[in-house]
């Protein structure tokens, strides 16, 4: 904007108002095309604010520094499941941590809604899934792959402590015969 404000009077004085509009009409689209690759790179390296805000609602992820949460949001994958569909099954290997974006998920009789995360036990304890998670309604989830999730959570002491608290509570509820918290 500043450069345009400086150049506009010079351009108008040199070639006139009409010709200036034609030049600007030709030059600006050409500049946009030339900078397109850099703009695409910027889009790929900037996390969506919605995904970042959703991840921040999960206590163990909220403890992470903002750049780490933004990186996780950039690497996250959006996944959908229809009502009644299993998302993860008890006994299978864990490969992702999930955060509910919309809809409802049921795990051992307990429901999880938007902003709730699940699947951390298998990833952080390196054990098979401890329960089946099923979509009660159509759900939109944000999925974090094992590697980035584990590295982020275990690499930051406050997040690791928050994760240990969640895991201990869920395993305690599971061993007591209750739904995980």
Task: Give the residues covered by each predicted segment.
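Transmembrane alpha-helix termini and helix-breaking/packing motifs in multi-pass membrane transporters
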Residues: 2-24
């Amino acid at each position: 904007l500043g450069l345009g404000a400086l150049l506009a009077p010079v351009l108008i004085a040199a070639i006139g108002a009409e010709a200036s509009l034609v030049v600007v009409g030709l030059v600006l689209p050409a500049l946009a095309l030339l900078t397109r690759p850099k703009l695409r790179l910027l889009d790929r390296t900037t996390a969506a604010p919605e995904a970042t805000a959703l991840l921040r609602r999960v206590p163990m992820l909220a403890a992470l520094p903002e750049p780490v949460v933004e990186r996780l949001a950039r690497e996250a994958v959006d996944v959908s499941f229809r009502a009644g569909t299993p998302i993860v099954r008890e006994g299978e290997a864990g490969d992702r941590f999930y955060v509910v974006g919309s809809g409802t998920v049921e795990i051992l009789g307990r429901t999880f809604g938007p902003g709730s995360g699940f699947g951390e036990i298998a990833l952080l304890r390196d054990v098979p899934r401890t329960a089946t998670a099923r979509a009660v309604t159509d759900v939109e989830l944000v999925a974090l792959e094992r590697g980035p999730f584990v590295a982020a959570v275990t690499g930051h002491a406050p997040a690791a402590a928050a994760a240990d608290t969640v895991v201990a509570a869920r395993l305690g509820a599971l061993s007591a015969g209750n739904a995980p918290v």
